[in-house]
């Protein structure tokens, strides 16, 4: 849809202040005044509904801020609830922790906890946390015994980053987590919202069906799958194929053409 950019003021609208919070408005002060195209498209569903969402968009297109919109909605609508942010790698977990230390802990006064193989907080820290950033394996282990861990039943939002890795080694763990959280929601009669973040997907409809996402046309649809062309920084792709069954001879065959391709397409820019 060709929508005008949503202003930052939408997080604390003067005419309907109950729809937001003043601290939400201050969260992005000095960073931007308008949300980008991807965030604008998904804003209403993320911030003004409790629908499950699948957001597929290229790297660097603002998916993290989109996830933050869902987190802000959870803080507003479910005070005392917990937000779980699941990232596939410890490095990504650490990146989120460093980014949110000031943004969410200082500005919003939320308690943030890291849960990975390197960091295992005690029970008191987990019970007092508003946001738990973790790897799939750690949350799988924690949530298995959910009946004995009351804080698991307080989860109101689960954000799964890089959910397209469902088809990789960690796929079965993500499947178990989603199924278990939906089961917990049914048993406790407390809604648990699931937001999946991904690159652009070829089978977005299948993944949306599995997540229980509404796909109807209109502003409340929970499926957003953007083309690579929506990147803020355009990306050109040039693909050359080389036959070869064995790795070393194939690499040797590709050496000179790779150098020639760099000289042709990126003669004055860094190359890796």
Language model segments and positions:
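Helicase-associated low-complexity/disordered flanking segments
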Residues: 1-45, 50-54, 148, 271
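Walker A/P-loop NTP-binding motif
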Residues: 44-51, 64-79, 179-184
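Conserved Walker A/P-loop ATP-binding site and its immediately adjacent core
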Residues: 64-65, 82-102, 140, 199-203
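Conserved SF1/SF2 helicase motif Ia
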Residues: 72-95, 185-191
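Conserved helix-turn-beta segment of the N-terminal RecA-like "Helicase ATP-binding" lobe
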Residues: 92-114, 209-217
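Conserved motor-coupling elements within RecA-like helicase/translocase cores
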Residues: 118-133
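SF2 helicase catalytic motif II
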Residues: 136-140, 147-189
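Conserved interdomain linker/interface between the two RecA-like ATPase lobes of SF2 helicase motors
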Residues: 193-272
